[in-house]
């Protein structure tokens, strides 16, 4: 199995309680499961203001969100190992973990896995797509040693 090279960007004032680069690489690799070659992605951890601005600009939603995924789009004839960018909002992840009574690192891992699957083309707009994506997220999270992230909803 190949590996995932992560360009980690910390753009939040409070770095206390953030996952390490090693953890993020482990979670992304578990989700992407690259075969052979190395693939690359950027993970940017931001505050609510940046998340809000990006969510409004790119999704038309006037609020911060937990994770935004920006897949790298490249012409078919060009082979680059770039998956794209994830933007994860520290405050939203912390708030959701608290509200859902989940361990904070488990929720961070889930956001990296969830966002990575979006970079691979998975989506959850339609019910059948959501079911497939959630099932895959559960398998990956359990493979990484975490509980089913959707257990409370079931």
From Swiss-Prot:
Entry GO terms, CC: cytoplasm
Positions that bind Zn(2+): 114, 118, 124
Keyword Metal-binding on entry: yes
PROSITE patterns reported for this sequence: UPF0054
Physiological role: Single strand-specific metallo-endoribonuclease involved in late-stage 70S ribosome quality control and in maturation of the 3' terminus of the 16S rRNA.
UniProt cross-references to HAMAP family, sorted A to Z: Endoribonucl_YbeY
Protein name: Endoribonuclease YbeY
Lineage, broadest ranks: Bacteria, Pseudomonadati, Pseudomonadota, Gammaproteobacteria, Pasteurellales
């Amino acid at each position: 199995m190949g590996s995932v090279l992560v360009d980690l960007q910390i753009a939040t004032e409070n770095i206390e309680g953030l996952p390490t680069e090693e953890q993020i690489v482990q979670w992304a690799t578990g989700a992407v499961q690259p075969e052979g070659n190395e693939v690359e992605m950027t993970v940017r951890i931001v505050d609510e203001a940046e998340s809000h601005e990006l969510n409004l600009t790119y999704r038309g939603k006037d609020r911060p969100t937990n994770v935004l995924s920006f897949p790298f789009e490249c012409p078919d004839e060009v082979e680059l190992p770039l998956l794209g960018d994830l933007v994860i909002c520290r405050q939203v992840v912390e708030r959701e973990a608290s509200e859902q009574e989940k361990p904070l690192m488990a929720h961070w891992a889930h956001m990296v896995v969830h966002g990575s699957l979006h970079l691979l083309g998975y989506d959850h707009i339609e019910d059948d797509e959501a079911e497939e994506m959630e099932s895959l997220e559960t398998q990956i999270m359990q493979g990484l040693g975490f509980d089913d992230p959707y257990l409370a909803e079931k």
